[in-house]
């Protein structure tokens, strides 16, 4: 009897929205390869590329620390926007309050050279941001002897054109930054909890900030945040259907807008979740961080 009860115990899984994005990238690895590796002698083979995408996905599931200047730059931009949405620059300057979360900020004037030697130098206002992702650990261990301190990353300094940042801040006037959303979806294999942090939540729309070196229209069409977050918000009693990716290459801004429709999007969401569950069950032996095999409440 006990064995039968154990066999029929329903399974419960969990995944955050951008993990589904990584899973989608893994599924699309071969298609992506033939889209971008178009030279006669590509630097990697299609098999090597697919293997890399597999390793990247497993590392993300296992929460292996990953750092890159591009990722840090994007995080610093996001935190800067959040800081100025919560408390405008004028008030920060008046209160001498130029720190927030992991950043310190100030306004500077950049001198920009033209493309040609004969072009005049122009001036442009910018935010200078010192980004310290290990700030909390640094503060907490400041009094410890050097030999006992953990190895911490050095702070990095980034500059962002003020007009670009201010466009985001103005657009998000009145928004709630970094809102945690969650919801549960029934699948053929059990329940899966979906969750994540919405960058900016407005009364009638949900927004995610994306930074990229190069942007092409529809870049985020295959991502899952524009389905997961409205799905979760609906379950939380917040009937927001409109989702925007607000994108910058640090010089210009772009938007992709999506409207959530339950009858169309929930079956798609269920399908990707069931494929994800099959993947993690098949690869259970290499998954060391087992959070994906448990509900949000059972961690």
Where are these regions (language model features)?
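Conserved catalytic cores of phosphodiester-cleaving nucleases, focusing on short active-site segments
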Residues: 77-78, 198-215, 229
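Coil-to-beta-strand transition motifs
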Residues: 191-195, 202-204, 238, 251-253
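Active-site-adjacent loop/helix micro-motif of nuclease/hydrolase catalytic cores
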Residues: 215-222
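An active-site-proximal "capping" alpha-helix that borders the catalytic cofactor pocket
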Residues: 223-234
């Amino acid at each position: 009897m006990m064995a039968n009860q154990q066999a029929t115990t329903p399974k419960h899984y969990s995944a955050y929205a951008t993990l589904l994005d990584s899973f989608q990238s893994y599924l699309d690895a071969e298609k992506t390869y033939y889209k971008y590796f178009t030279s006669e002698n590509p630097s990697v083979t299609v098999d090597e590329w697919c293997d890399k995408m597999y390793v990247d996905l497993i590392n993300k599931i296992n929460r292996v620390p990953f750092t890159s200047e591009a990722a840090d730059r994007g995080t610093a931009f996001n935190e800067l926007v959040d800081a100025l949405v919560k408390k405008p620059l004028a008030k920060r300057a008046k209160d001498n309050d130029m720190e927030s979360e992991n950043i310190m900020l100030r306004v500077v004037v950049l001198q920009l050279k033209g493309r040609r030697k004969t072009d005049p130098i122009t001036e442009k206002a910018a935010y200078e941001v010192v980004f310290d992702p290990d700030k909390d650990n640094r503060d907490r261990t400041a009094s410890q002897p050097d030999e006992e301190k953990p190895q911490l990353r050095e702070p990095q300094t980034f500059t962002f054109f003020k007009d670009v940042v201010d466009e985001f801040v103005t657009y998000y006037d009145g928004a709630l930054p970094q809102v945690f959303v969650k919801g549960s979806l029934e699948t053929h294999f059990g329940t899966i909890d979906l969750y994540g942090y919405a960058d900016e939540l407005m009364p009638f729309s949900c927004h995610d900030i994306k930074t990229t070196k190069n942007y092409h229209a529809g870049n985020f069409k295959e991502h899952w945040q524009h389905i997961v977050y409205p799905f979760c918000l609906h379950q939380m009693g917040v009937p927001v259907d409109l989702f925007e990716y607000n994108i910058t290459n640090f010089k210009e801004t772009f938007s992709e807008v999506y409207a959530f429709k339950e009858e169309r999007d929930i079956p798609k969401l269920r399908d990707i979740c069931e494929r994800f569950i099959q993947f993690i069950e098949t690869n259970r032996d290499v998954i060391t961080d087992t959070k994906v095999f448990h509900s949000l409440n059972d961690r």
